[in-house]
From Swiss-Prot:
The keyword Repeat applies. Belongs to the PPR family. P subfamily. The keyword Repeat applies. Keywords: Repeat. PROSITE patterns: PPR. SUPFAM superfamilies: HCP-like. InterPro entries: Pentatricopeptide_rpt (IPR002885), TPR-like_helical_dom_sf (IPR011990). PPR repeats lie at residues 200-234, 235-269, 270-304, 305-339, 340-370, 372-406, 407-441, 442-476, 477-511, 512-546, 547-581, 582-616, 617-651. This is Pentatricopeptide repeat-containing protein At2g19280.
């Protein structure tokens, strides 16, 4: 199938060329680029235009390319030497021929490959070839064939532009969607358009590495064995990356088989390979096997390095074995290895995370370690978790005094600390400082701020941060949406809750349990209890089991309005779903009975719950006590207070307030004093009873 880039004969391309404004834009934009050798970064791979591996042929098309070409060359802002070089090579090899008022040639995939070869042979500059490759695709108006792309990839690698080859191959892998047949076609085209064996080995290694990057580990493994049929094996770095993924996805057995295959193909074991196995053993909890392999490295002729020991130390710390990690750290010198900041920082971070900063400080002094950002981040995390933000801000300032610059993690830690205390004003001060520092806020940073603003009533600030996240191109997740949704729910903006759910679905984000909890709670608070109940029913019909919290909200809503029949239907529905109501669920139902002053029903339910193994808390007892006091049954209320004390729970202000209300209903004088005396008598009596006095 033929394409003319100069003679306007094809009706298909005729239509394309009639869109003159769009066409001139692409044309001028292409030729107004700066020198390719200076600005290669401008040729970023556009995944929306990169050819699919299945595009093995051009569509039939042609285009006039005569005097317009000359006039554009005269008027566009482009380095003359680059354009002249391409033009001269095309003329030299007769790709541009005199044809009436212009020049003419015909292009198909084979012709494109030959032109690419001629350009590279004459210039030895892969960037110039890439320039023509990109321009020709825009000019033709159809995607390049898989073979043309394959040849371009070989030229890029030959011209030391591997990073551009990575862009192209990565896009091909994405377009193939992991289909073995499509990737095999790509591999076939790469093999058939090879330049020399050295380049082919590099290209196949890049292809396999791209599969690994896309987490297509099975495909990467299959391609490895397929290229082995050509006598080619991936580079050492790619083998290590693939081995790491095999260990992550498939485990030790397949990883051992792959290592044996590596050895049979001339790849040798090294510390990096064995460190991956040490990491896997430790991640699975087999620290004894990890240590055995670490100590047995010498049997393979390999000396353990600081990286291998750091892997082992780090895994010990993350598993909570800080004493053992510290011991290994101090023994490193026995193996002729000096501790570095990474190995020491791992243990310091471990101590900080378990709330032992004093042990971390001892290590810093022992190894005379100059604190780095990672160490400071660990200390800040520990201090902020205690709520001591004054001390945390002092530590934060020390970072600057040492000549270090806080990273996004440090700023986010401070922001989170202030948000937990409700100090959103201080949190925004650090957020502003983060923006001024040039560090872009992470998804976590902004999500924390939105959550705090939603909790503490600054919904407009939460919306502002949310809009800024979308402007900055951050990929929002379900937690971000849930945090803002929570704020809308608290401010009774139910319409915006539904709008956010629609936006989530449009963005391809599936609502989770927390999303539905927020939605149902918001509806119950606004009084839409029946509608909330319908949502629960619909979720169950779709196979989604709502949480206990969602059931509790609706049960509480039904109970408050006195609709105990519907409340109990949901209660028994929970049992059918093998969900056990918790104390909060029971409190919601009992609160409804107490509010309706149906205390005989309330106490029967309470006793049944006790028999079923429920462990009531102070809130549940106070609910019943308040109910009995409201109907004037002070004696029964005192009996429940005694039972509560007997179970190890002391009365609180809510208990005292319930008694006061009950005594006032009985027209007692000095009801507050009398209530205090009653509580004291009950506590003393129960104390004597339990102590045997």
């Amino acid at each position: 199938m033929w394409v003319s880039i100069f003679n306007l004969k094809s009706s298909g391309l005729n239509h394309f060329c009639t869109r003159t404004k769009a066409f001139r834009y692409f044309w001028c934009r292409t030729f107004s680029l700066a020198s390719l050798s200076e600005n290669n970064s401008r040729f970023q791979t556009d995944s929306s235009r990169l050819p699919y591996s299945g595009s093995r042929y051009y569509h039939s098309s042609s285009k006039h390319f005569g005097e317009d070409f000359v006039s554009i060359l005269k008027n566009i802002d482009v380095p003359r030497d680059c354009v002249e070089t391409i033009r001269n090579v095309l003329v030299k090899h007769n790709w541009i021929q005199k044809y009436e008022s212009g020049f003419s040639t015909e292009l198909d995939q084979y012709t494109v490959i030959r032109i690419l070869d001629d350009l590279f042979e004459e210039t030895l500059d892969a960037s110039i070839v890439l320039y023509f490759f990109r321009w020709s695709e825009l000019w033709i108006g159809v995607e390049h064939s898989s073979r043309s792309i394959s040849r371009m990839i070989h030229i890029l690698v030959s011209g030391n532009m591997n990073y551009r080859a990575v862009d192209m191959l990565l896009c091909l892998v994405k377009k193939c969607s992991g289909e073995e047949r499509s990737l095999c076609l790509v591999m076939k085209d790469l093999f058939e358009t090879r330049i020399d064996r050295r380049v082919l080995e590099t290209v196949f290694s890049i292809l396999i590495d791209c599969c690994i990057r896309e987490r297509k580990v099975n495909m990467a493994l299959k391609l490895t064995y397929k290229v082995d049929q050509f006598g080619i094996f991936p580079s050492r770095g790619v083998c290590i990356s693939l081995l790491k993924e095999i260990l992550r996805v498939h485990g030790l057995e397949l990883a051992r088989e792959f290592v044996e295959h590596m050895l049979s193909r001339g790849r040798h074991l090294n510390a990096a390979v064995l460190s991956l196995f040490i990491r896997k053993y430790c991640s699975d909890g087999y620290f004894d096997k990890g240590w055995e392999l670490l100590m047995g490295m010498k049997h393979y002729g390999i000396r353990p390095d600081i990286v291998a020991f750091t892997v082992f130390i780090d895994k010990l710390c993350k598993a909570g074995f800080l004493k053992e990690a510290t011991s290994v750290l101090f023994k490193l010198k026995l193996f002729g290895i000096s501790q570095d900041s990474v190995s020491v920082s791992s243990v310091i971070d471990g101590f900080c995370k378990v709330g032992k900063p004093e042990e971390a400080i001892k290590l810093i002094h022992s190894f005379r370690l100059r604190p780095n950002i990672f160490v400071y981040s660990s200390f800040l995390s520990n201090i902020c978790s205690t709520g001591d933000m004054l001390r945390a801000s002092t530590i934060f300032q020390e970072i600057f005094e040492l000549g270090l610059l806080p990273d996004c993690v440090c700023y986010t830690t401070m922001i989170d600390g202030y948000c937990n205390l409700g100090r959103t004003d201080k949190a925004f001060q650090y957020f502003g400082a983060l923006l001024k520092s040039g560090n872009p806020p992470s998804l976590t940073t902004s999500t924390i701020l939105i959550g705090a603003c939603s909790r503490f009533g600054s919904i407009s600030d939460a919306e502002s941060v949310f809009r800024n996240m979308k402007t900055e191109g951050l990929k929002l997740d379900v937690v971000t949406y849930n945090n803002l949704m929570h704020g809308y729910g608290k401010t009774h903006q139910l319409n915006k809750v539904f709008e956010l759910i629609d936006e989530m679905r449009s963005a391809g984000i599936s609502p989770d349990v927390a999303t539905y909890n927020i939605l149902i709670h918001s509806m119950v608070v606004r009084g839409y209890i029946d509608e909330a109940n319908e949502i629960i029913s619909e979720l169950i019909r779709r196979g989604f089991v709502p949480s206990t919290l969602a059931f509790t909200d609706v049960i509480g809503g039904f109970s408050k309005r006195g609709d105990f029949q519907e409340a109990f239907i949901l209660w028994f529905y929970m049992a059918d779903l093998r969900m056990k109501p918790d104390v909060v669920t029971c409190s919601a139902l009992l609160h409804g009975y107490c509010k309706a002053q149906r205390m005989e029903k309330a106490i029967v339910l309470f006793n049944k719950l006790l028999d079923a193994g429920l462990k009531p808390d102070v809130v549940l007892y106070n609910t019943l006590i308040h109910g009995y006091c409201s109907v004037g049954d002070i004696e029964k209320a005192c009996e429940l207070i005694g039972l509560m004390v007997q179970r190890g729970m002391l009365p609180n202000e809510s208990t005292h307030h319930a008694l006061v209300l009950g005594l006032e209903g009985k027209r007692f004088v000095n009801s507050e004093t009398h209530a205090s005396m009653l509580l004291e008598e009950i506590i003393v009596a129960k104390w004597h009873l339990t102590s045997g006095g």
